[in-house]
């Protein structure tokens, strides 16, 4: 089935920031004399900052350190962003250039809060590619709820079923599927479970493979 618009996640899909975020959580926990396990960090991928805090609050060894953990995480993360270039995921520039050449509407759908999302897009020089950016600040419910992607489709004036979402995380892919959209998963830190992979249009090893698939679907 053809498509009319592409919706893209940001962290872990277009820019290589999920590792920075994970390290910020590690550093914040270490400063407080505790630690966050890797399995727990994997569960945070694709969630908004507030959703991350709610998840961590459920862990007794961490709940006692809130809200200091939240504050330190923000400080470490912003410091990392300000002290270096935001690395792009391989293939994202080629993909966005192709979407522009083909005049295919596209928008960002991110669980990051609005001001930080805009900062990341500006620093990574990806902002000019997008007229619409829907963030966690713009909706009542962030991923894995469908609100972000439904809002992005509405801004583009495209029916959800005519959108394809590019996502790296399980939470983000769940949001796309809940919005009745097709999703191509390009895993970053965590591979999707088999049940999720079966529901996806495809699981691609990188953005080059995702672009090739989009080109094939465009030619159908």
Where in the sequence are the language-model features?
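Asp-based, Mg2+/Mn2+-dependent phosphohydrolase catalytic module
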Residues: 1-4, 97-100, 113-220
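Active-site neighborhood of HAD-like aspartate-dependent phosphohydrolases
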Residues: 1-42
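Conserved SAM-binding loop
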Residues: 14, 88, 106, 141, ...
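Hydrophobic/aromatic residues within well-ordered alpha-helical segments
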Residues: 21-24, 45-49, 69-77, 113
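Helix-loop "lid/cap" segments that line or gate small-molecule binding pockets
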Residues: 28-29, 48-63, 120, 152-153
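Metal-dependent phosphoesterase signature
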Residues: 57-93
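Short, acidic loop-to-helix structural element flanking the phosphoryl-transfer center
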Residues: 81-108, 114, 118
């Amino acid at each position: 089935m053809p498509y009319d618009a592409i919706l893209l996640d940001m962290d872990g899909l277009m820019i290589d920031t999920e590792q920075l975020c994970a390290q910020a959580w590690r550093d914040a926990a270490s400063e407080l004399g505790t630690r966050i396990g890797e399995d727990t960090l994997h569960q945070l991928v694709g969630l908004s900052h507030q959703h991350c805090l709610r998840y961590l609050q459920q862990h007794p060894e961490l709940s006692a350190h809130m809200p200091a953990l939240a504050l330190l995480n923000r400080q470490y993360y912003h410091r990392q962003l300000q002290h270096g270039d935001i690395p792009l995921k391989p293939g994202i520039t080629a993909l966005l250039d192709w979407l522009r050449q083909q005049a295919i509407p596209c928008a960002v759908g991110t669980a990051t809060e609005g001001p930080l999302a805009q900062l990341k897009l500006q620093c990574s020089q990806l902002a000019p590619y997008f007229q619409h950016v829907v963030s966690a600040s713009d909706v009542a419910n962030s991923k894995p709820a469908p609100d972000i992607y439904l809002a992005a489709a509405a801004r583009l004036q495209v029916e959800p079923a005519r959108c394809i979402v590019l996502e790296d995380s399980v939470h983000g892919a769940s949001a796309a599927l809940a919005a009745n959209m097709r999703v191509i998963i390009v895993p970053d830190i965590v591979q999707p479970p088999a049940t999720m992979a079966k529901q996806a249009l495809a699981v691609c090893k990188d953005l080059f493979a995702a672009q090739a698939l989009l080109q094939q679907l465009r030619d159908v």
